Swiss-Prot record:
Known to bind calcium. Residues 23-392 form the GH18 domain. Microfilarial chitinase, which may function to degrade chitin-containing structures in the micro-filaria or in its mosquito vector during parasite development and transmission. Belongs to the glycosyl hydrolase 18 family. Chitinase class II subfamily. Disulfide bonds join C27-C52, C480-C493. This is Endochitinase. Sequence repeats lie at residues 407-420, 421-434, 435-448. Keywords: Calcium, Carbohydrate metabolism, Chitin degradation, Chitin-binding, Disulfide bond, Glycoprotein, Glycosidase, Hydrolase, Polysaccharide degradation, Repeat, Signal. CDD domains: GH18_chitolectin_chitotriosidase. O-glycosylated.
Length: 504
């Protein structure tokens, strides 16, 4: 398709019109960012107008029976106030064409409940019916599945997704409404991809695939690296040649996912380390500890982009890595890897050349959303994405025309009540801010390890906090994040509350 030609296809399906638009610009909104103090506090009113084609509201949850539930006390409307669901979906009134999806799950939610649903026909049916009712009740345009990860249950996962798509189509026919969109956030790790996804089946049923091409490196490793880099780099120690955006996207495409459905993930935050030797700063430099606490992550190890801008003003030195396409900043013994405007523009040009469907960000509250930290106006990173992708139509994405919505009141921001469930979730978020790749990596101990099978994830023989990722019979010893262990039954790094007594 010629880049200068705008083609509109009108498909009559279920009494609705489906229109093909340009590149996707997806934006995750996190419902726990409301609890940050001061300049980090983020509410629906902070969401920009016109920069996102899709807003993904993170997160909702589901119980063991399969029933949909809100995560926060103020997600839904009450008799006395409008909730954050309404505040976010209301943005469509001033942004025609915007789609707002509800994202279910997330890293902290885990895999067990989704697995139980997928393995039970009765629970699957209940889950789908509940989800449709919940989405319609709260005026969402679709469902985003953030199941991290369906390792070992790829076929059950695929059948669940197929059943959801079928039900969404049938519901649109009977209701006369536009079909609910069905999307997913998925792993960029080869081992997880191989063990979790029937890609050919998913390619037929997902409307969009949000590739979490970040957190490929982090402070769980003992060497610094760019966690969302585009290409492999010299000096990389773990995931050599495969822990990069290009490999992950191309691998999904090679396994049968249509390129126009693959949406490239761009982090709005940095992964950080404390250098062992501040004079050694190149990729691969030794760093045995996470970076210091930040305002967005008191546990350390990450920092938002707006915090990076402040560190730069305080004397940090930024280097753009041309080979890998990523940036890093060094300030004393603190090392942070991230994307800036320059590297994002390179990534956008790359994805257009490769034929991918667009980009998405994790997350809105990590960009300089106030414009006060970087001195470049609000949302410098998201604006870089939007300016490169807006108006393009090389790889269109299919959505349906806007439904009618009921007039709602403005979101009320003076609520102060907070439940114990919210407090627990917010604490979890400080441990893992990116809601993405559950497995994390350390390849210092690969020597001498053998692969039981050509590809897959396997327990470490002596340490429950490690596991072995095999790719083409090459063994990589990986390390789970702090306070987790490798659960071989579900093939993920799981919370220690589920660990056997022998795992200390």
């Amino acid at each position: 398709m010629n880049r200068t030609t705008l083609i509109l296809f009108f498909i009559i399906l279920s009494n609705t019109i489906t229109v093909i638009h340009g590149y996707v610009r997806g934006c995750y909104y996190t419902n726990w960012a409301q609890y940050r103090d001061g300049e980090g506090k983020f509410l629906p009113g902070n969401i920009p107008n016109g920069l996102c084609t899709h807003i993904l509201y993170a997160f909702a949850k589901v119980d063991e029976l399969g029933d949909s539930k809100p995560f926060e006390w103020n997600d839904e409307d009450t008799e006395w106030s409008k909730g954050m669901y309404s505040a976010v979906t209301k943005l469509r009134e001033t942004n025609p064409g915007l789609k707002v999806l509800l994202s279910y799950g997330g890293y902290n939610f885990g895999s067990a409940i989704f697995t139980g649903i997928a393995k039970s026909a009765q629970k699957t049916e209940r889950f789908i019916k509940s989800a449709i009712a919940f989405l319609r009740k709260n005026n969402f345009d679709g469902f985003d599945l953030d199941w991290e990860y369906p390792v070992g249950v790829a076929e059950e996962h695929a059948k669940l997704v197929e059943a959801m798509k079928t039900a969404f189509v049938e519901e649109a026919k009977t209701s006369g409404k536009q079909r609910l969109l069905l999307t997913a956030a998925v792993s960029a790790g080869k081992g997880t991809i191989d063990g979790s996804y029937n890609v050919e089946s998913l390619g037929k049923n997902f409307d969009l695939l949000f590739l979490m091409s970040y957190d490929l490196h982090g402070s769980w490793e003992k060497n610094v690296d760019l966690h969302g880099k585009l290409h492999p780099t010299k000096g990389e120690v773990s995931g050599i040649g495969i822990f990069n955006t290009e490999f992950a996207a191309d691998y999904w495409a090679s396994k049968g996912m249509p390129k126009e459905k693959i949406i490239i993930g761009i982090p709005m935050y940095a992964q950080g380390w404390t250098l062992d030797n501040p004079s050694e700063t190149a990729i691969g430099a030794a760093a045995s500890r996470p970076s210091s606490a930040s305002k967005t992550n008191p546990a350390g190890g990450t920092a938002s982009y707006w915090e990076i801008c402040k560190y730069l003003k305080e004397g940090g030195k930024e280097t753009v890595h041309q080979e890998g396409v990523g940036a890093y900043m060094v300030k004393g013994d603190q090392w942070y890897g991230y994307d800036n405007e320059e590297t994002i523009r390179i990534k956008m040009k790359w994805l257009k050349e490769k034929g991918y469907g667009g980009a998405f960000i994790w997350a809105l509250d990590f960009d300089d959303f106030t414009g006060k930290s970087c001195g470049k106006g609000p949302y410098p990173l998201l604006n870089a994405i939007s300016s490169e992708l807006e108006g393009e139509s090389e790889n269109p994405e299919i959505t349906t025309e806007e439904p009618s919505i009921t007039e709602t009141e403005a979101y009320e921001t003076d609520e102060t009540e907070e439940t114990s469930e919210t407090e627990a979730y917010d604490t979890d978020e400080t441990e893992e801010t990116s809601e993405t790749e559950a497995t994390t990596y350390d390849t210092d101990e690969t020597e001498g390890q053998e692969c039981p099978e050509r590809d897959g994830l396997f327990p470490h023989p002596t340490d429950c906090h490690l596991f072995i990722q095999c790719a083409n019979n090459i063994a990589y010893v990986m390390q789970c994040p702090a306070t987790t262990f490798f659960n071989d039954a579900i093939k993920v790094c799981d919370h220690m509350t589920n660990a056997p007594d022998t795992c200390i």
